[in-house]
Amino acid sequence: MKRPTSSSRKSKKQGEDLAFSEEGSLPAVTMEQKDEAEMEEVDDEEEEEVDEDMAGGHAAQSPSPSCGLGEKKRRLALEQVRALERSFDTDNKLDPDRKARIARDLGLQPRQVAVWFQNRRARWKTKQLERDFAALRAQHNDALRADCDALRRDKDALAAEIRELREKLPTKPADTAASVKVEAGNDAAAGAAAATVCKDGSSDDSDSSVVFNDEASPYSGAAFIGFGPSFLVDDASAATVGCSSSLPALESKWHGPYSDDSCKGGVYGFTEEWLAACSGEMAGNDAAGFFSDEHASNLNFGWCASGNEGWE
């Protein structure tokens, strides 16, 4: 057997690399690309470390514990940091000419100056936002407090007004209720009086037999008291005396209920002699026409004491 030569080994290695790239669908990484990636990582680490160690006493170099190649960290001196702060307070924007001048004066690289300004602007923006937020919050709290105080004052004023109105309300309803009660009492009294009059002077049963009370009937003996001559006197006292004096004459002429035959000649309870005497006494008066012959026929009633016979 022949031993494999160096050329065959190289071709075999290239074939393996190509197969790996085809299987993983990834391009083959060359040595140049690896070197460029390592340089970019180193630059990023330097940018982060410049801002973290800018408060150091003087420029010092120390080996990185995480890096096995023994790379050095660069720290900014206190004088350098103060000079950069003064430059930032003057103008936080950094142009290329100014960046080169600051780096030359402080003995730094232009890239270090650019990274420091970038980080300082980020911190300045954060602090500015915090200050603005604190100012807005204080202003908002003051406005809310003022609005709350105004609302409380309005609430107290409205509560006082409500109390005043409530104190005034009970008087008017009480007067109204009292007037309503008085009117209701008057209406009830009037209704009771009307009911009493109807009960004493009228009869609910119109179909029943006609029965009159001697005192309430218009044809009773009390209704004819005072028909004598003394009743026509103008004086009220004389009329009263006439009524009382005519009572014996009325009693003398009253004979009570008569029989059926006596009812045919006159009115119920009165005789023709008594009516003639009354008409003769009042012949000279104006009211005598009430008992004249033509009106006397109207006083003849057709019922008798028994009430069994009809009109005649």
UniProtKB/Swiss-Prot annotation:
Please list the tissues where expression of this protein has been recorded.
Expressed in seedlings, roots, stems, leaf sheaths and blades and panicles.
What CDD domains does the entry give?
Answer: homeodomain
Example GO CC term: the record gives: nucleus
According to the record, the residues making up region (Leucine-zipper) are: 127-172
Where along the sequence lies the DNA-binding region?
A: 70-129
- Gene Ontology molecular function, alphabetical: DNA-binding transcription factor activity, RNA polymerase II-specific; sequence-specific DNA binding
Keywords annotated in UniProt: DNA-binding, Homeobox, Nucleus, Transcription, Transcription regulation
Matching entries from Gene3D superfamilies are given as: Homeodomain-like
Give start-end positions of Acidic residues composition bias: 35-54
Keyword ATP-binding: yes or no? Answer: no
What subcellular locations does the record give?
Nucleus
Annotated region described as Disordered, given as residue ranges: 1-74
The superkingdom listed in its UniProt entry is Eukaryota
Gene Ontology BP terms: positive regulation of DNA-templated transcription
Q: Tell me its family.
A: Belongs to the HD-ZIP homeobox family. Class I subfamily.
Provide the function of this protein: Probable transcription factor.
PANTHER family linked:
HOMEOBOX-LEUCINE ZIPPER PROTEIN, HOMEOBOX-LEUCINE ZIPPER PROTEIN HOX13
Q: What is this protein called?
A: Homeobox-leucine zipper protein HOX13
What is the native source organism of this protein?
Oryza sativa subsp. indica (Rice)
List the gene name: HOX13
